[in-house]
């Protein structure tokens, strides 16, 4: 589950920190993890007209359910900060692809709603949609890089132990 260990990393400077708040094994065998992340405020200054949006970072809460038997990861996240103005929600599911279990089938949906800011709210929604869509693709690329690095480390450790055993 590279997803649960990938942030922060050197590939995405917008993730400032990520702290595990809770981790437990549920009765169905799933591992439940709740994290809070601090993410850089990427809103352009033009869209930061409201005082509560003039912050360095936002906090997001993420909940994950990892079923190792089914190889299924479900992720739900929402914003904790500025929630009186903006509601951001995202849900993702990672499962083995039906035609090749070595591939991952990835589904994601999300919403951004801005409350009570009129045309400024509409501009924030449009910006957020574009930024988050690009961010989802960027997150996939980061995950692939981290998985490749992890595989290289595992292979090199195994190989060096084999040579020097």
Q: What are the roles of these predicted feature ranges?
A:
Residues 34-51, 55-56, 60-63:
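Eukaryotic helix-linker segments that join adjacent hydrophobic helices
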Residues 11-12, 23-27, 48-56, 66-165:
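Terminal "cap-and-tail" regions of soluble proteins that handle hydrophobic small molecules
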Residues 1-43:
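Hydrophobic ligand-binding cavity/cleft-lining segments
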């Amino acid at each position: 589950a590279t997803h649960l260990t990938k942030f922060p990393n050197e590939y995405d400077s917008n993730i400032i920190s990520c702290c595990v708040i809770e981790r437990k094994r549920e009765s169905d065998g799933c591992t439940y993890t709740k994290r809070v992340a601090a993410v850089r405020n990427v809103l352009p200054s033009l869209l930061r007209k409201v005082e509560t949006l003039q912050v360095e970072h936002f906090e997001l809460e993420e909940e994950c359910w990892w079923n190792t038997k089914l190889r299924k990861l479900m992720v739900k996240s929402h914003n904790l900060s500025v929630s009186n103005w903006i509601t951001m929600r995202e849900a993702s599911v990672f499962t083995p692809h039906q035609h090749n279990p070595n591939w991952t089938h990835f589904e994601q949906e999300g919403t951004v709603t801005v409350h009570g800011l009129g045309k400024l709210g509409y501009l924030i929604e449009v910006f957020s949609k574009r930024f988050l869509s690009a961010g989802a693709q960027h997150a996939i690329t980061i995950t692939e890089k981290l998985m490749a690095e992890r595989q290289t480390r595992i292979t090199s450790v195994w190989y060096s132990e084999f040579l020097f055993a």
